Amino acid sequence: MKKKLTQLTIALALALPLPAMALTVTTTTDATSLANTLVGSGVTITSATLTGAANQQGTFSGAAGAIGIDSGVILTSGDARLAPGPNGSDGDGASLGTAGDADLNALIPGFTTFDANVLSITFTTNTGNLFFSYVFASEEYNEFVNSSFNDVFGFFIDGVNIALIPGTNTPVSINNVNCGNPYNPAGGTNCALFNNNDLQDGGPFFDIAYDGFTNVFTASITGLTIGASHTIKLAIADAGDTVLDSAVFLKAGSFSSVDPNPVPEPATLALLGLGLAGLGLSRRRKAA
């Protein structure tokens, strides 16, 4: 009898849904620790430096259900501790009174950046390639879409920005990835790549504080010199004002020399086709 009760208890426990993980953030100013959180296969980190206030950056976990990345490093233009959801305000942010960044200024001619958060990593790669996964999120969605109040970020490898919309040369930004704003909801750009979490639109829909965020993107560069030192500068800042926060979530272990989304070789596709054809023939024979 006792054995049956134990088996029933185990069965019920397995049948119950697991509690959803919630996004948590642990702030740090240790650049090496942040860099080591990101490093993956085929990449060796030799040094790292950080520009940022005490609570501006850190590590995160439990975010898979919210943004599609479970854990990694968060860089913000304000306070990383404001990132966990649910979204309770359209105006979360921290004004730090710190300087902007010249490389980010160059991405938005005519505007000035503030409160820059910069993680610079010197590394080598054993293939000449680098890939990593990330999500960009902001409190400036959706009210400031198509305005000049757009926080800015960039991933500069040896000075070249690779924070681009997949398959294009267009930088990822609030104005380039959105579903419009409350005053012009039909005026979206790359809406399929955007996730709306705005209270004005009936949110929150995701367990994160930001009003909107992109899909998981993969940044990449090929043709680097194998074994040579290269530097990547991961930077984000307020632009136009210092009021609302934005963030970049970088996936743990995704700084890799191996493409996480490889395109199958033609021979592999041919073998897959033959396998499916054989499966279909086998099923027809059984039916006969």
Regions found by a protein language model. Name each.
Residues P17, N87, F144, D245-S246, ...:
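Short linear functional motifs in flexible/disordered or boundary regions
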Residues L18-A22:
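Sec/Tat signal peptide C-region and signal peptidase I cleavage site
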Residues R285-A288:
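Short, charged juxtamembrane terminal tails flanking transmembrane helices
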Residues M1-T9:
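Bacterial N-terminal signal peptides that target proteins for export
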Residues P264-S282:
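A short, hydrophobic C-terminal helix/tail in secreted or cell-surface proteins
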Residues T9-P17:
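Bacterial N-terminal signal peptides
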Residues L23-N261:
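Aromatic (Trp/Tyr/Phe) and Gly/Pro-enriched flexible surface segments
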Residues A15, P262-P264:
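Generic structural signal for beta-strand residues in well-ordered domains
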